[in-house]
């Protein structure tokens, strides 16, 4: 009988853990008494008239009513615990949402302060900061071409018009390449065919020899300018 009564008593350990207090013994006794009366078939609802007129019957009716009220209190307590859990869950969601909103707003403000405008501007700025290889190549070719264009005419101007006498310094500047200049002279002489270019050191030319004709002089000047331009182009490309 006692095992049946204990098994029918509701388990209030979850409620005790959530509330933090132990269930009163009076409430447990009332629940046990209600179960005992239910099993014996003598449970009376509130408001039911008692057939007995003695004092014992009245005390029993009061105990049954008290147990019924305590059972209602337990149900109300369980509903309050459930409501409290729902309120805690809603408050947690609101706090998390507020934290995320403040974090996002701080990130957005930092992004605006860094970019000085819209967020898309930072992406465009990062793409614009990447080096453009095609533009660099075009600039390099233009700079090389402009350098060669400025070097070749200046050398032609320094050498003077065809037929004019040249100094030993100008001739030494043209043949400063040494063996490379000789090779270029031989190749160009072979291509021209009709031009017989004979390379001579500056010392031999100054010591004496037959004067060259103006046509040969002008052809040599043109060839030397072309060779010097090719040499400058090779040097710049190597750099």
Swiss-Prot record:
Main location: cytoplasm
GO BP terms, alphabetized: positive regulation of canonical NF-kappaB signal transduction; positive regulation of cytokine production
Keyword Oxidoreductase: no
Keyword Repeat: yes
Source superkingdom: Eukaryota
Subcellular location: Cytoplasm
Low complexity bias (residue ranges): 107-116
Coiled coil: none
Record region (Disordered): 107-139, 200-219
LRR repeat start and end residues: 55-83, 93-114
Modified residues (Phosphoserine): 118, 126, 129, 213
Sorted UniProt keywords: Cytoplasm, Leucine-rich repeat, Phosphoprotein, Repeat
GO CC annotations on file: cytoplasm; cytosol; intracellular membrane-bounded organelle
Function: Acts as an activator of the canonical NF-kappa-B pathway and drive the production of pro-inflammatory cytokines. Promotes the antigen (Ag)-presenting and priming function of dendritic cells via the canonical NF-kappa-B pathway. In concert with MYO18A and CDC42BPA/CDC42BPB, is involved in modulating lamellar actomyosin retrograde flow that is crucial to cell protrusion and migration. Activates CDC42BPA/CDC42BPB and targets it to actomyosin through its interaction with MYO18A, leading to MYL9/MLC2 phosphorylation and MYH9/MYH10-dependent actomyosin assembly in the lamella.
Quaternary structure note: Forms a tripartite complex with CDC42BPA/CDC42BPB and MYO18A acting as an adapter connecting both. Its binding to CDC42BPA/CDC42BPB results in their activation by abolition of their negative autoregulation. Interacts with CDC42BPA and CDC42BPB.
Name under which the protein is recorded: Leucine rich adaptor protein 1
Organism: Homo sapiens (Human)
The encoding gene: LURAP1
